[in-house]
């Protein structure tokens, strides 16, 4: 499956936001001007976006934050629209309960791409069973543990240190860094999710 492997700064500038594609310990440097679009004429690209363009940019931003392709993202939207409640909130909750995202939230990896790799390399166990599917949906009460091999990886140990230093662990997960394990306590409410995402724009886009 195709994945973007180019400069993370380029993506961040395209969306005008930090997409959490770099470790908090290596934040986007001063050369990455988020207010300036990438390309030779990026500085000149100003002006008010149309409603459609604004909606499209928000969708692209969220896709890139969670590392999804269009078909995957659209499938999540379709699933969210069939559930009871607010479609936009349902969408974010589905994305947040992906196994790779939960591993990222627990601090087992410094970025979501790194968490996805950890999962695909069979470094993660859910309720004692090895799971290598990044999109696996985690439920409240599920226990996440790293394999013995993953626990010995320096990047995993460093990720946990960074998470503790930057107080990155959200309230809906519980982590025991010494045991390389955690519990997904509950599906997060909208108030607990990123405030810089306007999911209503995505709903408007797909509703057309």
Swiss-Prot record:
Name of the protein this chain belongs to: Small ribosomal subunit protein uS4
The UniProt record lists the keyword Ribosomal protein: yes
Alphabetical list of Pfam families matching this protein: Ribosomal_S4, S4
Any one GO biological process: ribosomal small subunit biogenesis
SUPFAM superfamilies: Alpha-L RNA-binding motif (SSF55174)
Stated role: One of the primary rRNA binding proteins, it binds directly to 16S rRNA where it nucleates assembly of the body of the 30S subunit.
Family: Belongs to the universal ribosomal protein uS4 family.
PROSITE patterns: RIBOSOMAL_S4, S4
Subunit structure comment from the entry: Part of the 30S ribosomal subunit. Contacts protein S5. The interaction surface between S4 and S5 is involved in control of translational fidelity.
Residue ranges of every copy of the S4 RNA-binding domain listed in the record: 97-160
One cellular component term from this protein's GO annotations in UniProt: small ribosomal subunit
